[in-house]
């Protein structure tokens, strides 16, 4: 990551990935009446089928919201062994169709949230009870849901691995933030390098990244310094 023509041009500072967040309090109510199980959310097929069931059970409410619809299709297609892009742009092949169909069915029934804003917002208002979002967004999820009538409820939010397609590769998007440098005076360039070495030292990078909800960028930081 951060390379162009085999040259490192962006120095990584913090990383994140995508995970599934679930309002377990609301899910447990749904489960008690329908038999829905959390392990059904391990696959996209299971998640979208559950979204349809939830919409019917709840009278049209959305079950699921994805923060990054493009990522869903790109990662999903690649996980099924096809290239997402071709020379003309997006390759709308069989794997894309497979990813599209359950997504579209859930959207048509109302089980998939297609509103604007971040995925944290419909979970805070009770308009959805599950979302795929950046691991860094954990700081924006609330343990209190406030609905449109200003009624509040204390809830438990849990995190689960991002779903995969049945028979597909376990694949998930990663992202992060980094720093680019530009040519300057020798003194300023030296100061810049000194600062970056200081910030990316394993233990310090763990403290910096985790305080912001991100993950460290060094293997040493993961293995030795990341809090259990």
Where are these regions (language model features)?
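Extracytoplasmic/periplasmic solute-binding protein
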Residues: 3-13, 18, 45-95, 128
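Extracytoplasmic/periplasmic substrate-recognition and gating elements
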Residues: 105-111, 147-221
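A structural signal for short loop-to-beta-strand junctions that line the ligand-binding cleft
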Residues: 1-27, 62, 159-172
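Short helix-loop capping/hinge motifs at secondary-structure junctions, enriched
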Residues: 26-37, 57, 185-192
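Short helix-initiation/N-cap motifs at beta->coil->alpha
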Residues: 42-48, 112-125
């Amino acid at each position: 990551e951060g390379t162009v023509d085999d040259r490192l041009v962006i120095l990584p500072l913090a990383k994140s990935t995508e995970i599934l967040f679930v309002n377990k309090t609301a899910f447990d109510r749904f489960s008690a009446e329908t038999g829905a199980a959390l392990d059904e959310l391990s696959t996209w097929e299971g998640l979208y089928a559950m979204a349809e069931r939830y919409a019917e059970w709840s009278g049209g409410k959305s079950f699921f919201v994805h923060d990054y619809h493009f990522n869903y299709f790109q990662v999903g297609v690649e996980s099924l062994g096809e290239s997402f892009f071709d020379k003309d742009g997006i390759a709308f092949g069989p794997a894309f169709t497979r990813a599209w169909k359950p997504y579209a069915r859930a959207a048509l029934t109302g089980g998939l949230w297609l509103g604007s804003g971040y995925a944290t917002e419909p979970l805070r208002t009770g308009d959805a009870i599950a979302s795929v979002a950046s691991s860094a967004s954990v700081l924006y999820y609330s343990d209190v849901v406030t609905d449109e009538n200003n009624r509040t409820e204390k809830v438990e939010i849990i995190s689960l691995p991002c779903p995969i397609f049945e028979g597909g590769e376990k694949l998930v998007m990663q992202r992060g933030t980094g720093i680019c440098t530009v040519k300057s005076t020798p003194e300023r360039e030296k100061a810049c390098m000194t600062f970056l070495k200081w910030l990316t030292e394993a233990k310090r990078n763990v403290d910096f990244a985790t305080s912001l909800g991100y993950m460290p960028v060094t293997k040493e930081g993961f293995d030795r310094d990341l809090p259990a």
